[in-house]
Amino acid sequence: GGMGGIGSDEANTIDIRREEARKAASVLEADYHCLEARDGYLFDTEELRLAISSLLRKYQAGIVMTHLPMDYHVDHRVTCNIVEAATIVATLPNVPISEPAMEITPLLYHTAPLTLTDPIGAPIVPPHFFVDVNSVMDTKREMLQYHKSQQTLMKVMHKMDDFFGVVYQGNKDYGTMVGVEYAEVFWQHLGGGFQKDPVVQDELMEFVRKNN
């Protein structure tokens, strides 16, 4: 997020964003890793694919989540390509990294932040499922409140006085589509070579909703 600094240079903004992300991750007691790719200039490179492959193998990730391939933000779309490429080779021993190959290809899921349209405004494939997140919205709010620099950026860049309010409204809009207060949306990656077992859907069955 180094390009998104308001009143701070790129290096200082990177430090701020990194610390904000670390604090947000700590709410979930999760590890945070930054691969130091430059904000706004992200490219799908061998180096980044291998870095993601290393992390997947280090944590023996069974489930991987990333952006949509038709996300509104170009960096997000590139991230999706990198993550997909790294995930599909998780079991291949010839990938030139030190971590041993995994026994099974992780499940891959995509999610969307605010809208169900592509970069030119066309409707995208409807979500495969929604998850009722009302019971964890307080946790989401706690995590988001650490991202103060993002709120500041949106006030200047998009004239949004309450960016986090827009995020919460997006959850409410998704919830309205399936009859709950707040929801998140997900798509399972069903391309060739990927596992297609609905593990997340089964594990969260109590909270999964469909928009029929």
Task: State where each predicted segment sits.
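A conserved beta-strand->alpha-helix junction
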Residues: A25-G40
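Short, surface-exposed alpha-helical segments at coil->helix boundaries
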Residues: I14-R22, C80
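Metal-dependent de-N-acetylase/amidase catalytic core
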Residues: F43-N212
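Glycine/small-residue-rich loop that forms an oxyanion/phosphate-binding "nest" at active or ligand-binding sites
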Residues: R17, Y41-F43
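ATP-dependent adenylation/pyrophosphate-handling site
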Residues: G1-N12
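Short, conserved catalytic or adaptor-binding loops enriched in Gly and charged residues
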Residues: K23-V27, P100-E103
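Residues that cap or flank secondary-structure elements
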Residues: N12-T13, D44
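A generic structural signal for short
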Residues: D9-E10, G40-Y41, V156
